[in-house]
Amino acid sequence: MFQATTIIAVRKGQQTAIAGDGQVTLGQNTIMKQNATKIRRLYEGKVIAGFAGAVADAFTLFAKFEEKLKQAGGNLSKAAVEIAREWRSDRILRRLEALLIVADAEKIFIVSGSGELIEPDDGIAAIGSGGAYALAAARALNAFSELNAREIAVESLKIASGICVYTNEQISVEVIEK
């Protein structure tokens, strides 16, 4: 659905990490930027979020989500439900072309433009053009290594960047510890 990036979230032990690559692609064939940051800290640093899709749309969604987070007193689940509900029902928001991954120390959610809200069973979620590759790599690394959440997120993005032409190895990471 949305190309030009990969975002992965991993929760393992006492650590939750979201990582994203830095590539910004114009159309199907032009790399415009190599070191963009697609991960942000929200709500006094207690929540981390990453986006895939149109940058302006993602910033609009970040602002809306942070507003919902403040209204919910930092309750990630409640804010995620509210932004998904608003996204689905608002005619302007429905046109936004972006996906979000949001996480705190306890939960991870994917919020989609169609108003879907998905909480992964295994504490690992990925979005973007390289999302399936990063997700598979992260699940394998989680099951068969002693790496922590941050290390799994970074290594899975490196693997995805070797497969997906819209993903690079200029990785930014944010981590929350319990």
UniProtKB/Swiss-Prot annotation:
Query: What reaction gets catalysed by this protein?
Result: ATP-dependent cleavage of peptide bonds with broad specificity
Q: Which domain of life is it from?
A: Bacteria
Spell out the activity regulation: Allosterically activated by HslU binding.
Location, primary (coarse class) = cytoplasm
The family database entries (CDD domains) matched by this protein are listed as: protease_HslV
Active-site residue list: 5
Top-level class of the enzyme under EC nomenclature: hydrolase
In short, the EC number is 3.4.25.2
Residues binding Na(+) are 161, 164, 167
Q: Which SUPFAM superfamilies match?
A: N-terminal nucleophile aminohydrolases (Ntn hydrolases)
Q: Which Pfam families match?
A: Proteasome
Q: Which InterPro entries match?
A: ATP-dep_Prtase_HsIV_su, Ntn_hydrolases_N, Proteasome_sua/b, Proteasome_suB-type
GO:BP terms for this protein?
proteolysis involved in protein catabolic process
- Which Gene Ontology molecular function entries are recorded, alphabetically? metal ion binding; threonine-type endopeptidase activity
The record's GO CC annotations read: HslUV protease complex; proteasome core complex
> What is the annotated localization of this protein?
Cytoplasm
Q: Which UniProt keywords apply?
A: Allosteric enzyme, Cytoplasm, Hydrolase, Metal-binding, Protease, Sodium, Threonine protease
Carries keyword 4Fe-4S? no
Which Gene3D superfamilies is this protein grouped with?
Glutamine Phosphoribosylpyrophosphate, subunit 1, domain 1
Functionally, this protein is described as follows: Protease subunit of a proteasome-like degradation complex believed to be a general protein degrading machinery.
NCBIfam families per UniProt: ATP_dep_HslV, PRK05456.1
Description of how the protein assembles with itself and partners: A double ring-shaped homohexamer of HslV is capped on each side by a ring-shaped HslU homohexamer. The assembly of the HslU/HslV complex is dependent on binding of ATP.
Member of which family?
A: Belongs to the peptidase T1B family. HslV subfamily.
Q: What's the protein here called?
A: ATP-dependent protease subunit HslV
Taxonomic path:
Bacteria, Bacillati, Bacillota, Clostridia, Eubacteriales
